[in-house]
């Protein structure tokens, strides 16, 4: 039987996901057979697994850090918020229904927890180490009885817990003490030590606080991780939507059910992006309609709030319009949806020659394609699709060449006048394509072309893990685990 190590935090947003990612790479580098795990994740951003199901982006990234193919076993329960206090429940990669928060807590949660623990124990039997990520705070008093992502998991497999605090936001010592005081004695005994994350300054200034914690709880501070400027995707529960107007003004419609907004990180890094919600704000050089958890409802929201008309007017004035997945479907001529919204046939925005019908079977695949859109014709791109929609068009954006490593020849997306839409999530992570697209608009504005500095997820994981390795006592962790 392998070992388990759990990363919990004093609150949401302390950096649990990336500390876990770093530890996944560190232990993989040390030669251990390591895999990630999170029993339940609530996320607007999902990614395809090797089995063809969905998992959260956090566990997808951690799998890469472990040098493993992303599996549905790494994130058995995925909750995808739909609005109105409802979420789609995805179990082992497959949607099993839509429930209210109350119904989920009272009915499905414990049953799914038991099944997810069977998955965790099977992983521990087959691997040297499972690095488990918790969720939010482990001591929310109103939720603790229903919490299946923190100490209940640690107790189930007797996993030592590293408690992470975000010192950048202040109050980290109080958060650690408060968390420890609200844990039961059994739970406190599972805590092996503390990590202070995102520190700017001289760590020696913190030593009096370290001594206090060690004296009070008999637990060591395992390290202080500096604030790291990085390009790894963060967990999205507390995601900030930037309002940065770059030389090319890129506006992204912040839909009520926006999903997979990690698609736009490269645009944010290369130029800056501006998320907008009001019709009067819409006047960018590039206007993007992102993916949506409920395409038709978001289209109707845009229509009722004047955003659809504002997009059409901006397009008439010369703005370039882009749609990704659900955004692509909205830009077409019509959508027939009896799956997500049950509204039947709905008129689209009409900027793309495409029609979409929603099927009950979701397509969740890794894709490699060749671009047909003229300014980037012939470029090889890759990404992934997560969709119910099936679209037909007279002018496709690209031809898919590979689906999950299997050779195919399928058209996808659509092209119109100063408009394109695609099902390829991650299209802008293809730097050659993004550079060509931005420079097309820059030339129109009389700006000099730019060269986007290429980077890879692998490089960023290695750089982040190296800093974490230098900042925490990994040898102590190895000895504590008995590896």
Swiss-Prot record:
InterPro entries with a match to the protein in the record: Class_I_gatase-like (IPR029062), CobQ/CobB/MinD/ParA_Nub-bd_dom (IPR002586), CobQ_GATase1 (IPR033949), CobQ_N (IPR047045), CobQ_synth (IPR004459), GATase_3 (IPR011698), P-loop_NTPase (IPR027417)
Q: Sorted alphabetically, which PROSITE patterns does this protein's record hold? A: GATASE_COBBQ (PS51274)
UniProt-annotated catalytic positions: 325 (nucleophile), 425
Q: Which GO terms describe its biological process?
A: cobalamin biosynthetic process
The UniProt keywords, alphabetically, are: Cobalamin biosynthesis, Glutamine amidotransferase
Q: In which pathway does it act?
A: Cofactor biosynthesis; adenosylcobalamin biosynthesis
One term of GO molecular function? ABC-type vitamin B12 transporter activity
UniProt keyword tRNA processing, yes or no:
no
SUPFAM superfamilies, alphabetically? Class I glutamine amidotransferase-like, P-loop containing nucleoside triphosphate hydrolases
Q: Where do the GATase cobBQ-type domain residues begin and end?
A: 247-433
Which Pfam families does this UniProt record tie to the protein? Answer: CbiA, GATase_3
Q: What does this protein do?
A: Catalyzes amidations at positions B, D, E, and G on adenosylcobyrinic A,C-diamide. NH(2) groups are provided by glutamine, and one molecule of ATP is hydrogenolyzed for each amidation.
Entry's PANTHER family? Answer: COBYRIC ACID SYNTHASE, DETHIOBIOTIN SYNTHETASE
Which family, according to the similarity comment? Belongs to the CobB/CobQ family. CobQ subfamily.
Record protein name field: Probable cobyric acid synthase
């Amino acid at each position: 039987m392998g070992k388990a190590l759990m990363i919990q935090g004093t609150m949401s947003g302390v950096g649990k996901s990336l500390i876990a990612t770093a530890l996944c790479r560190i232990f993989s580098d040390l030669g251990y057979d390591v895999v990630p795990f999170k029993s339940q994740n609530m996320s607007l951003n999902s990614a395809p697994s090797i089995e063809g199901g969905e998992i959260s982006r956090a566990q997808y990234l951690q799998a890469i850090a472990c040098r493993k193919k992303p599996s549905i076993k790494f994130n058995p329960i995925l909750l995808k918020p739909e609005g109105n206090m409802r979420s789609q429940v995805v179990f082992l990669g497959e949607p099993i229904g839509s429930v209210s928060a109350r119904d989920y807590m009272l009915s499905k949660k414990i049953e799914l927890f038991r099944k997810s623990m069977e998955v965790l124990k099977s992983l521990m039997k087959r691997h040297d180490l499972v690095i488990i990520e918790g969720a939010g705070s482990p001591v929310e008093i109103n939720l603790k009885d229903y919490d299946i992502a923190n100490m209940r998991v640690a107790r189930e497999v007797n996993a030592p817990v590293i408690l992470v605090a975000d010192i950048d936001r202040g109050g980290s010592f109080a958060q650690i003490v408060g968390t420890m005081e609200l844990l039961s004695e059994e739970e406190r005994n599972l805590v092996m030590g503390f990590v202070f994350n995102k520190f700017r300054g001289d760590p020696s200034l913190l030593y009096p606080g370290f001594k206090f914690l060690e004296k009070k709880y008999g637990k060591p501070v395992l390290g202080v991780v500096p604030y790291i400027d990085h390009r790894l995707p963060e967990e999205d529960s507390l995601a900030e939507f930037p309002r940065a107007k770059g030389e090319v003004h890129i506006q992204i419609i912040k839909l009520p059910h926006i999903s997979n907004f990690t698609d736009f990180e490269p645009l944010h890094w290369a130029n800056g992006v501006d998320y907008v919600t009001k019709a009067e704000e819409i006047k960018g050089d590039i206007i993007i309609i992102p993916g949506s958890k409920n395409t038709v409802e978001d289209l109707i929201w845009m229509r009722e709030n004047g955003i659809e008309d504002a997009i059409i007017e901006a397009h008439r004035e010369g703005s370039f319009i882009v749609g990704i997945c659900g955004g692509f479907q909205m830009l077409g001529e019509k959508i027939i949806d009896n799956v997500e919204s049950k509204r039947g046939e709905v008129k689209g925005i009409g900027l793309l020659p495409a029609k979409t019908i929603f099927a009950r079977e979701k397509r969740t695949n890794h894709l490699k394609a060749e671009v047909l859109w003229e300014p980037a014709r012939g470029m090889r791109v890759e990404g992934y699709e997560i969709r119910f929609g099936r679209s037909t068009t007279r002018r496709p954006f690209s031809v898919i060449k590979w689906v999950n490593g299997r050779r195919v020849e399928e058209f996808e997306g659509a092209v119109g006048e100063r408009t394109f839409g695609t099902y390829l999530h991650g299209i802008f992570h293809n730097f050659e394509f993004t550079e060509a697209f931005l420079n097309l608009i820059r030339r129109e504005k009389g700006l000099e072309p730019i060269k986007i500095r290429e980077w890879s997820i692998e490089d960023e994981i290695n750089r982040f893990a190296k800093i974490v390795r230098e900042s925490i006592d990994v040898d102590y962790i190895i000895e504590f685990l008995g590896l």
